[in-house]
Amino acid sequence: MHNLLYKSKGLATRWLTLIAFVFVCLLTHAQNAQSHNKQKDAEQLGKALEYFASQKYHECLLILQGLDKQYRLNPRYKAYLGVSYYYEWDYENAVKHLSVAIPKLVNFAPHERSFYYWALAESFFNLRHYEKAVPCYHEMLKLCYDKERAEAYYRLGFCYLFGEDWADAWSNFYAAQNSFRKYRPGEEPARMAQIGNMLKALNGKVANEALMHIGINEAKGK
């Protein structure tokens, strides 16, 4: 009986040792596989950056979409993801990612940030969320190059136009006209003609609005 018990204990010990050995082997294999996957994902992230820099936004998006599901991407890569969605005309996802990323990029280069604000503003604009687009265009104007200002003023003109804010629409179309003339002379003849027509059409509305405002003030004064 004692010998049988001893043999049973010995057999159990050998089984436990074997199980432990197999577990360690599996754990080591899993760790090695995990390490390999992380290295592969890091290489994929590098490829995404290369695609983004070369303006291959579709390819960049395919990589970042997958990585975004597995990791917590840093704000810059979140911004890259948002911009890639913008260029794929997926404006809702562009807004989702850029809105999260931009506030965390305050220490980045001004022009880089202006580009993200532009993509966010354009996404809101294309979704017809004009009121939300306005502050984004204004933030872009604080950071962008002078030659880029005309586009923002032009879009702001339409944002205010669609909101029937005639005076601000006129002011921004006028600013766009001046910016095109000063920083991009002769580049956008069709756009300049359109802006000229918009200003003419708005002149009457702005004048009528001013007259109504004066009339209201005079009535209050009496």
Predicted regions located by residue number:
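Alpha-helical segment of the N-proximal tetratricopeptide repeat
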Residues: 42-66
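Terminal, low-structured helical/coil segments at or just beyond the last alpha-helical repeat
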Residues: 179-222
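TPR/TPR-like (Sel1-like) alpha-helical repeat modules
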Residues: 161, 166-184
